[in-house]
Amino acid sequence: MDLITQLQDKLDHLLYVFGTCIGVLQRDAPPSFFNNPQNQQQQQQQQQQQQQQQQQQQQQQNPQTQQQLPPPPPPPPQQQQQQQQQQQQQQQQQQQQQQQQPQPTEEWDAPSKMALQVIETSKVIESYIEKLPGFDKTEDQQYEDLKNLNTQSKQVSNELLSSRRDAIELLKMVKESILYISEESKNEEIDQQPMQQ
């Protein structure tokens, strides 16, 4: 098998490895959670900070109106209890979600194995490329080599044509010889038959 074919086979193999890697990653990768409790807490803190900043800006813009308005009354006890119950329910739901989500029990090592396979295949491809003739030559040198190869090809083609002509002539001579021999043998048989009678 020539180097170009081997190189093509290895490139096809590398493409197959990449496709397999993507499939394995889609199939076996551990789940990633976008709505984890830490992100939710950070979002709540950011919202509270934004609300506080907005309130401070409003107070700075309208200090007289803020002084005239009495502070809001505290919420009734029933409303406070409802808010506490809602918070507890949310916390319980988050805990249940965390328990239901599968936790990776062992380290997932498929990416490192696939990366090694890609690296090994790439090294083989590089070695094939380095073995290609003319890889270290300039464009002019490669052009000269191609001209020489073309000249050699024409010479070989001419030699092939002349040997073909010679073979055709030899074949004609062999056919003529066979025909001559067969006619002579017939004539001898004919000559021998009258003698026998």
Curated annotation (Swiss-Prot):
Please list the coiled coil stretches. 38-101
Query: Where is composition skewed (Pro residues) in this entry?
Result: 69-78
The record's principal subcellular location, in a coarse class, is nucleus
Region described as Disordered: spans on this chain: 29-110
Q: Name one GO molecular function term.
A: transcription coregulator activity
Gene Ontology annotations of biological process type: regulation of transcription by RNA polymerase II
Instruction: Note whether Iron-sulfur occurs among the keywords.
Output: no
Bias (Low complexity) occurs at 37-68, 79-104
The listed locations are: Nucleus
Keyword check for Nucleus, yes or no. Answer: yes
* Alphabetical keyword list: Activator, Coiled coil, Nucleus, Transcription, Transcription regulation
What InterPro entries would the database entry show?
Med7/Med21-like, Mediator_Med21
Q: Which SUPFAM superfamilies match?
A: Mediator hinge subcomplex-like (SSF140718)
Pfam families in alphabetical order: Med21 (PF11221)
Q: Which GO terms describe its cellular component?
A: mediator complex
How does this protein assemble? Component of the Mediator complex.
What's the family? Belongs to the Mediator complex subunit 21 family.
Q: What does this protein do?
A: Component of the Mediator complex, a coactivator involved in the regulated transcription of nearly all RNA polymerase II-dependent genes. Mediator functions as a bridge to convey information from gene-specific regulatory proteins to the basal RNA polymerase II transcription machinery. Mediator is recruited to promoters by direct interactions with regulatory proteins and serves as a scaffold for the assembly of a functional preinitiation complex with RNA polymerase II and the general transcription factors.
Q: What is this protein called?
A: Putative mediator of RNA polymerase II transcription subunit 21
What species is this protein from? Dictyostelium discoideum (Social amoeba)
Gene field: med21
